Amino acid sequence: MYYRNDLKFYIMLKLQAETTLPTDFGNFKLLAFSEKEEDWMPHLALIAEGTELDTVTNIRIHSECITGEIFHSRKCECGQQLDAAMKYISENGGIILYLRQEGRNIGIINKIKAYQLQEKGFDTVEANLKLGLPADDRDFNPAIEILDILGVDKINLLTNNPEKM
């Protein structure tokens, strides 16, 4: 459901769970946000230890990438980008918003099909379009809503794609 008087579209996420997560990069607070507690794919926020949320906050919005983050695929740099963001935010404070929208939000099965087309010479956008899918179907409204829930209103957005801003 989407609502909001100020024209922002919200999904009505709620904080469902949180814990401290020790990582190779330092300690983070891990928070899970979803509409319902039983949602098995919540959006996640990793907040570096010592982060002040009432000042300008470093933010990295990262979309899930199973092939790059878990299997270290050479077809993308997502795993390396996430590692670099975790290192930077651990050292400088901030939040990583991990949005559950695999393969530009086309899902893992369609992403595998797109990979197969890439083996035939198509790039990512061409492969998605050939499959009848959008070039990029990601929705960043959950990131806005999570930042709103956390009370963050001044950000320094960390990106490797400034042309997408």
State the predicted function of each range.
Residues Y2-M165:
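Catalytic domains of riboflavin
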